[in-house]
Amino acid sequence: MESALLLPSLLLVAAYPRGGSPQQEWMQSPPAPSVTSAPFWVRLNPELEAVPPGGSAWLNCSHNCPLPVHSSLRTQLRQGKIVNGSGWVSYQLLDVRAWNSKVRCVVTCAGETREATARITAYKRPRSVILEPPVLVGHKYTLRCYVTHVFPVGFLVVSLRRGGRVIYHESLERFTGSDLANVTLTYVMRAGLNDLWQPLTCHARLNLDGLVVRSSSAPVMLTVLALSPASIALASTSIATLVGILLAVGAVYVRKYLAVQT
């Protein structure tokens, strides 16, 4: 009988060793909470920076790695000062002359490497866009548009508009110079009666892979219509005929008037 009573006690001790109870054992060994770590990221700002040729720029590379990291900026541009803080590094880039430069920030955190990219564009808006008044040469008009101090010329499109409608445009992509340049566009046109007092304008547009820079000239107008020799001869004949008709009609009325008076 005693052995029968001891068996449950032994089983209880085996289930809860060290004299603990079910409630005490749960309090001593709570379940471990699940922890989800944030994904490792790297950012480079601004992602697109525009500067004048020969200018400088600052790019900021930031990350969320809590550990000491190794970071570097990879670019063909000349680097200047470096300023860093907790989770970020700022890099200075000097003498930017290429119209389009790619920059990469590479960060390694706990053996994992990530990178972010940015682009620096060097450009110069035209200092001026000037359309000269039309010049009559022979029986056609010559238009000249001057675009001054612009870069890069290879991404420039110059167009002429009459009354808001494009009558001519030219892309200068064949030019590959790396300096500021002046551009002159010459266009010869005929004009009709409908072109009189229509505003003529010249427009310069830089297309820089997503960045569009526009400039335009003040309007000029056609105030005199150029006529060909045939047109002049026809007009002279028409005028002479009209004058003759008017003189004949006038003579008839004069004779009738004199007859009535007598």
UniProtKB/Swiss-Prot annotation:
One of its GO terms (molecular function) is integrin binding. Keywords: Cell adhesion, Cell membrane, Disulfide bond, Glycoprotein, Immunoglobulin domain, Membrane, Repeat, Secreted, Signal, Transmembrane, Transmembrane helix. The chain crosses the membrane at residues 232-252. GO terms for biological process: cell-cell adhesion. Belongs to the immunoglobulin superfamily. ICAM family. PANTHER family: INTERCELLULAR ADHESION MOLECULE (PTHR13771), INTERCELLULAR ADHESION MOLECULE 4 (PTHR13771:SF8). This is Intercellular adhesion molecule 4. It comes from Mus musculus (Mouse).
